Amino acid sequence: MFVIIGWAVSMACIFGVFIAHGGNISVILHALPWEMITIFGAAIGAFLANNQMKVVKATGRGLGLCFKGSKYSKARYMELLALMYDILQKARKEGLMSIEKDVEDPHSSPLFQKYPTVGNDHHVTEFITDYLRMMVSGNLNAHEIESLMDSEIETHHQEEHAAVAALQRLAGGLPAFGIVAAVLGVVNTMGSVGQPPAVLGGMIGSALVGTFLGILLAYGFAEPLAGLLEQKVEDAGKEFQCIKTTLLASMQGYAPQVAIEFGRKVLFSGDRPSFSELEGHVKKK
């Protein structure tokens, strides 16, 4: 929603001021279709040549996320931490083996079904159950599991950030393709040098639209989307860090209510529930 609003504000300011100062918008509209095909088509072709198919697909998914509201909120994190509390509390009271069935089949587990917002998220559920399974097996100590968690989180970050980098490269190339379109327009204009000045002026104006569009598409559209997607990637990584910190605190002997406090402190301040909010939510559940 805010992406559309941001674009609308940018376009209104740019073209509104241009028209207010007596600019002829018809010149831009006349040149727009062919210049867009040249610039955008060349940029998409370069994008496909520059990225593996998995990155292209990840970029497509990422662009879809940019037009949706963030799923990461205080309410989601309270559910996540309440789930972690229930799991760790059960393991503390009944032993680690008591959560084995929950770990092996989380979709049928009453614990995970109790918190559908988190329990229905495949990536989060898999991350939690993978490391709970290692804790149940008892083959790895806290330092070894922490190292493994760090490696997985880093891999996840690299995979998600590949789409961000691809969009940033696309944004970097758009002004250059705008110049290419402008140069081609100038070449056409030079072939018509015998035309009256009014005709030549229109042709030169159309050629300059290419440079304008390249810069506008880069810094008005592609670069903001890359920045927004990067923020969403950071939000996703923060959730995994919260899980990691909570589980490691539990492995180091802290009680469940203290372990989830470790996890709470990792969250960004805007999404972090207060101590009393989390305590009340856990007790209510």
Question: Residues of each region from the PLM?
Answer:
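Large intracellular
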Residues: F2, I19-H161, A236-K285
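Hydrophobic faces of alpha-helical transmembrane segments in multi-pass integral membrane proteins
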Residues: I5, V9-C13, P33, I37, ...
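Helix-termination/interfacial motifs at the ends of transmembrane alpha-helices
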Residues: A8, I14-V27, I145-L148, E152-L229
